[in-house]
Amino acid sequence: MTKVTLKGNPVQLEGKIPSPGDKAPDFKAIKQDLSEFSLKDYAGKVKILVAVPSLDTSVCALETKAFNEKAAGISGVTTLVISGDLPFAMGRFCSTEGINSPNLVTGSQYRDFSFSKAYGTHIADGPLKGLSARAVFVLDKSDTVRYVEIVPEITTEPNYTAAIAAANAAL
């Protein structure tokens, strides 16, 4: 099991983290309108998969807003932000924060943990048990993993520059 920290305290992650060059595993998540989507729904596009515990935390909110700003203008790239929030909370967050880019989709895994388990970000213990650790994956148009960042301390932001560079390189 992979370990990360939450405020300096170790937590275990469940699942196998895909490596660059691996075929990305499919997953299911729920949009704000309660419809289900999967990775296959974004076939043929470069994807930035952003795993966050909850949009109601300050770091997750900052991260989602940052990816909305940094990736929204890149034609051919879709950002999928996956969290444990209910779709209603995601809708409220996006509305309040002015996040309405068609290139950024929020997805809830409240019904199904297939994303966090397939991508090795499922928190197995500690106070955030059942949520996803903070991570970023970039997939090319054929769903091959091109970039992976498992953020070692859950309360810190990822490397936006590296993720955006990987997405641009995958175009």
Curated annotation (Swiss-Prot):
Catalysed conversion reaction: a hydroperoxide + [thioredoxin]-dithiol = an alcohol + [thioredoxin]-disulfide + H2O
Active site: 60 (cysteine sulfenic acid (-soh) intermediate)
Enzyme class: oxidoreductase
Keywords: Antioxidant, Disulfide bond, Oxidoreductase, Peroxidase, Redox-active center
PROSITE patterns reported for this sequence: THIOREDOXIN_2, TPX
Gene Ontology molecular function, alphabetical: thioredoxin peroxidase activity
Domain Thioredoxin residues, every copy: 18-169
Keyword check for Acetylation: no
Disulfide bond among keywords: yes
Other facts noted in the record for this chain: The active site is a conserved redox-active cysteine residue, the peroxidatic cysteine (C(P)), which makes the nucleophilic attack on the peroxide substrate. The peroxide oxidizes the C(P)-SH to cysteine sulfenic acid (C(P)-SOH), which then reacts with another cysteine residue, the resolving cysteine (C(R)), to form a disulfide bridge. The disulfide is subsequently reduced by an appropriate electron donor to complete the catalytic cycle. In this atypical 2-Cys peroxiredoxin, C(R) is present in the same subunit to form an intramolecular disulfide.
Free-text function comment from the UniProt entry: Thiol-specific peroxidase that catalyzes the reduction of hydrogen peroxide and organic hydroperoxides to water and alcohols, respectively. Plays a role in cell protection against oxidative stress by detoxifying peroxides.
Annotated family: Belongs to the peroxiredoxin family. Tpx subfamily.
Quaternary structure and interacting proteins, as annotated: Homodimer.
Name assigned to this protein: Thiol peroxidase
